[in-house]
Amino acid sequence: IADNIGSKFIILDEKREVVRIILNHIYIDIANQVSSTIEGDLCSRDFSINSIAFLFDKKCLFDPLNGLKDLEISLLRTHSENNLLNDPLRILRCFRFVSELNFKIDFNLITFIKKNKGKLYLVAKERINYEIQKIVNGANALDAVLLIKKLNIFGTDNLSEDSFFLDLEKINYAELNQEEKE
């Protein structure tokens, strides 16, 4: 496909057969079907906006979870909490969507995040660091960081005392709060 449209091709996960095509700053991820049905695959994705497929045989989009509607209104919504629990890093990915794309997070997803934020300790620090870098470099970083603060994502009530998250408490929230008031 990449050769036919003159785009860049990157292997993201050779074992799971996931590749990315980049064309004019547009990223298209292509994955081999894992479930017995395309709907099963899409329903195992993290967010509805990532649960849209192009059916080559029918030349149309397949959107069983209404991801296109959520894209139109910039809403981040999940189909299944278990999909997020399979990789707790997805909790932080929510804030990256806020930071980079100015998405709003669905109320049910906020409730899930509050309930499960302590599971972030299960994720490798390097992966968390990558997401934090993406969050703080987004166009709406302040909104995302303030939401992270409001939901107490890195609060010590959820993490062990030797956690590297405790360093994040040193963020100058007073300065962030002042910027929010301006």
Q: Model-flagged regions — what are they?
A:
Residues I1-E182:
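Catalytic cores of the polymerase beta-like nucleotidyltransferase superfamily
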